[in-house]
């Protein structure tokens, strides 16, 4: 896909819905001829467990290699089977700040997120989905586990939330 007019950003936590989000991103990109960008953020507190600076640096370097390998293992089969390019990147830091910075720098037209399974006692909800909904006026596709949506057929499964399109696939 040489000169694409549109950009799709897949935001992932590298958990169960990541594969579905990527598959749906590929389907959407074929329909609208878009580039796909994959982005993952991890909190530093999930990586570093010690107070020692040297151990912290070691943990960060190890997690960098592990995360890069995980992302490549996820993306490589899709790139090979679909003959498309997927640009990937990841960051360690404050999740909301890193997502906001990446969205501002890449300027996507469509953002695809995977939704988590609802917990029985969930009072707050999914903070990242709500954050993206409130702070960015882009088309947002929220993919749940097991979703295999056919974007080539006509559909009207979208609804307006806060004055913009949100598609729940």
Task: Give the ranges of each region predicted by the language model.
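Short glycine/serine/threonine/alanine-rich loop segments
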Residues: 34-35, 84, 108, 138
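Gly/Ser-rich helix-loop-strand patches that form or flank binding pockets
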Residues: 102-152, 159-161
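General small-molecule cofactor/ligand-binding pocket signal
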Residues: 37-39, 87-91, 141-143
């Amino acid at each position: 896909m040489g000169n694409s007019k549109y950009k799709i950003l897949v935001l992932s936590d590298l958990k169960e819905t990541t594969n579905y989000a990527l598959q749906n991103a590929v389907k959407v990109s074929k329909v609208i001829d878009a580039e796909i960008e994959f982005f993952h953020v991890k909190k530093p507190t999930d990586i570093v467990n010690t107070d020692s600076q040297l151990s912290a640096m070691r943990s960060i370097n190890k997690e960098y290699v592990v995360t890069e390998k995980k992302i490549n293992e996820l993306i490589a089969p899709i790139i090979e089977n679909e003959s498309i390019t997927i640009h990937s990147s990841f960051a360690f830091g404050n999740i909301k700040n890193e997502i906001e910075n990446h969205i501002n720098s890449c300027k996507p037209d469509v953002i695809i997120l995977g939704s988590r399974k609802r917990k029985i006692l969930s009072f707050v909800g999914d903070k990242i989905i709500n954050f993206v909904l409130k702070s960015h006026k882009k088309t947002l596709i929220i993919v749940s586990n097991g979703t295999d949506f056919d974007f080539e057929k006509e559909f009207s499964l979208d609804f307006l939330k806060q004055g913009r399109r949100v598609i729940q696939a």
